[in-house]
Amino acid sequence: MVGQFKLIAQTDPHFSQFYAYPLGINPGLAGVNEGDFRANAVFRTQWSQVMTPYITKGVSADIVTPKNLNFGINLLDQSAGDGGYHYQHGYLTIAYSGVRFGEDDNQQITFGIQVGALARKFDPSKFQFGDQWNSITGYEPTASSADQLPRTSSSDLDMGAGVSYADARDRVPVRLFGGFSAFHLNRPQDPFVTQSIAQSLPMRFVLHGGFQWAINERVAITPQFLVMKQGTAMEQMAGISVRTPFAAAADLVAGVNYRFNDAVAPYLGFGFQGLVLGVSYDVATGNLSKTAPGTSSMEVSISYTGRKSGRPIRYLSCPRF
């Protein structure tokens, strides 16, 4: 149980609908949207068929100002498994979007900085250690254990930064988007190791991108990718979505993401006047699906992008789920 807990403690939570939590993948995405303000929420539950589920909830909001400065906030909470573990973070983001070039300055580079707090805690009463087991009577919850971690909670300052590129040209069929970011720049300490060992939380690096291809006036496809590395953990995801109108002011989005050696995640979204509802379901495909069947996950997301009255739409290449 301790080994599993250490793995959880040193890797950040993730979402299959990763663009539904934009500031969690890149502070440089603050204000990179087609409106003047945006709000996102995403809920994920995983492994509920085989154990106490991991539940992850994230919310974010960002605004655009006329001064080439964008501001954002994002909050996340994850309750993980049988150990009573909670991972929480909250960040404020400021981004500069004044680097523009091309015809009519409609290609944009945005730099973002994120500062906030990272909190982790667990309930040691929910752990079962080897020396609490009796060969005759079995597990004895009242028995003390020599395997005690030095701390059960921690709060630390945390920092991240990122850069993104978006294309707002309206007369080209293909528009690129992408970015790079790094998190835990100040290397917060891991509180759940022995006092004789100083170990920092590994930095997390993210590379993401793709393009939007307008096949015609009604149909657009968006291939995309995400690569994340944190310590020895690596996540690679690629996918494609199709967006088409099906009613007045309403869009339908359907697609699939593949997380290499882990899961396939089909998703479906419905958009109406700036509001987007999305749902996805991870079907495990890697070794975990063979050793522990029923380890699938489900996500539900909601996003709203709004504009001030009278301001034109900025057609930035920024996918929404």
How should each PLM-predicted stretch be described?
Residues 10-321:
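Subset of outer-membrane beta-barrel
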